[in-house]
Amino acid sequence: MHSNGTMLLLYALASIIILILMIAKWRLNPFVSLILVSIGMGAVTGMPLTKVLSAFQDGLGSGIGSTASVIALGTMLGKILAESGGAERIATTTIKIFGPKLIHWAMLVIAFIVGIPIFYQVGFILLIPLVFTLGRASGISLVKLTIPLCAGLATVHGLLPPHPGSMQCVEMLHADVGKTILYGFIVGFPAAILAGPLYGNWITPRIQLPAHNPFAESLEGSSDQDKNLPGFWLTIFSILLPVLLMVFSSGANIFLPHGNNIRAFMNFMGDPVVSLLIALLVSMVTLGFWRGFSSADLLKFTNDCLGPTAGILLLIGAGGGFSEILYRAGVSNAMADLSHVMHLSPIMLGFIIAAVIRVATGSQTVAMSMSGGMLAPIIFSTPGFHSPELLVLSIGAGSSILSHVNDGAFWLLKEYLNMTVSQTFKTWTVSVTIASIAALILTFGLQALGL
């Protein structure tokens, strides 16, 4: 690799270390820290300062993008579920079915199922109110409940179509969608078990969360706990409605041709913002008006819960700005070049390339799409390689590794659980890395079986 590429990697590493020190040791505001490090990274790599600022703003806008709408609508839906008693109904029923000792396993199963058709952030925002309610009702640590939730959602996001990164890899590598989904389940669920309930059990006693959690408190119901709670299935329907709409949209893309009006309509209905909006409006009726709440009550609920979301939106946006600076500076290409010169099997090479791009950019989707494009001409010329589905899985596994401060999901978990940066590394970063390595090992296992 050229010396320029080596210097880029050193600059990127230094910027990440400085960012961590700013936030964790020097206690500087994370949003301000991300701006300063982004400007510094752009300057030392030779970008004109005006272009540094425009790149950061572009990344910030793209980082927030529809995420702002998703977080706002999902938070409103969670608040209505809490105020109506719906979240409490799910919590009490879940505790009754699984028992307090198995609730964290239930969260993994729920996350794995719900996460199939939706983005990680959407699933997290949709299910985190349930985590808060279950934690309050059972007395179990939020860490023990949230780690399985995050592991399930993140694993599905990286390994299973119809998520955009894996779908792009399937198309570029000419893999079979059905086989990829089947192998993805075989690889993904055991990996999520290791990274979720098992690692969560180990790390929970080592993480002490603050007693005050503004997000949990903003989603607490204010009415009497002895009230008549809504039905379990009605509440489940309110949570799963956006998921069902997204599933129908994915099905339409598979079974209906381009240009079909029904497909276009289902794609519109299955958009995360539209599906959450529909679910919110339905819940306002079924869990709001039907249960005696007035329009003024619903307005108060939906306004009061939005305050704590401002900080996380800024951090997600700033993380996107930092990622854009790294991308435009050429860091991801330098990391890919470093991996490319190593003489490795396609599966190992796919894992490494996706991993280094993920670490550089903070995006699973970008890591998978770039890796698939780079590896397609290689595997087509590699004699004896007949497992593009396994290559898709290895790329997905690599794209999950070492999520850190340039990933919006890192800040999402940190803020919602009110953790420190150090605690977020110990929980989120380690968990997704365990899932990543486990998925790679299991992928090699499938290859050894001749699949």
From Swiss-Prot:
PANTHER family: GNT FAMILY GLUCONATE TRANSPORTER (PTHR30354), TRANSPORTER, PUTATIVE-RELATED (PTHR30354:SF26). GO terms for cellular component: plasma membrane. InterPro entries: Glcn_transporter. The keyword Iron-sulfur does not apply. It is found in: Cell membrane. Its main location: membrane. The chain crosses the membrane at residues 4-24, 30-50, 62-82, 108-128, 140-160, 180-200, 229-249, 270-290, 306-326, 337-357, 375-395, 430-450. It is a multi-pass membrane protein. Belongs to the GntP permease family. Pathway: Carbohydrate acid metabolism; D-gluconate degradation. One of its GO terms (biological process) is D-gluconate metabolic process. One of its GO terms (molecular function) is gluconate transmembrane transporter activity. It holds the Pfam family GntP_permease. Keywords: Cell membrane, Gluconate utilization, Membrane, Sugar transport, Transmembrane, Transmembrane helix, Transport. It comes from the Bacteria. This is Gluconate permease.
